[in-house]
């Protein structure tokens, strides 16, 4: 697969297989195309040549993924509880609250996310991605702003919630992710 942006080749001859239950670290220097590759996997961009097939012969028009983008994509006026519960209609607010309480104090669950600090917002986004019914988790810089203790706790949570799903972490370094297979751009 190849992708060009503004007449500059961002990705060239990419051939990467991600199977269910795989855990990958997509890494490389800033500007190497990591986020673009995620956008291609998600179907948000089209390759200039080649194709994207995920988890074998994928039969759907789009990827069924839990996603953490680089920027926190939240409904700003809704609470953390509402932001998490809204992505899974089978999930009660009580269960959403239990998941959030693993990382946030109870009193922070019901305030609008626009009032949360950047790390709290990142935790809401990460929890939401993990509870969406999906085949794979795609996590772009999911630990931004977190110290190593919190990062390690979040990694354990992600691995637990992923179950048999594939996971792709996107980061410039492998801190805490030494257990992942690496794909370097």
Q: What is the predicted role of each segment?
A:
Residues 112-120:
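Conserved ABC ATPase signature
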Residues 93-108:
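Conserved ABC ATPase "signature" region
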Residues 126:
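Hydrophobic anchor residue at the start of the ABC signature
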Residues 42:
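Helix-to-loop junction immediately C-terminal to a conserved catalytic motif
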Residues 50-63:
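Conserved ABC transporter NBD signature motif
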Residues 140, 147:
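ABC-family nucleotide-binding domains
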Residues 71, 77-95:
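Q-loop/switch helix immediately C-terminal to the Walker
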């Amino acid at each position: 697969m190849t992708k060009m942006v503004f007449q500059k080749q961002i990705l060239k001859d990419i051939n990467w297989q991600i199977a269910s239950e795989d855990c990958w670290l997509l890494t490389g220097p800033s500007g190497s195309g990591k986020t673009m590759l995620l956008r291609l996997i998600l179907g948000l961009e089209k390759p200039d040549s080649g194709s994207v097939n995920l988890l074998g012969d994928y039969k759907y028009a789009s990827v069924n993924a839990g996603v953490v983008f680089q920027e926190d994509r939240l409904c700003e006026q809704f609470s953390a509880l509402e932001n998490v519960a809204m992505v899974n209609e089978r999930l009660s607010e009580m269960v959403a609250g239990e998941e959030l309480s693993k990382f946030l104090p109870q009193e922070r669950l019901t305030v609008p996310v626009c009032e949360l600090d950047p790390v709290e917002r990142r935790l809401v986004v990460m929890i939401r991605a993990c509870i969406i019914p999906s085949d794979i988790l795609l996590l772009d810089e999911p630990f931004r702003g977190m110290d190593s203790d919190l990062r390690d706790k979040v990694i354990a949570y992600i691995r637990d919630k992923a179950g048999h799903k594939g996971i792709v972490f996107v980061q410039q370094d492998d801190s805490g992710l030494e257990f992942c297979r690496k794909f370097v751009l």
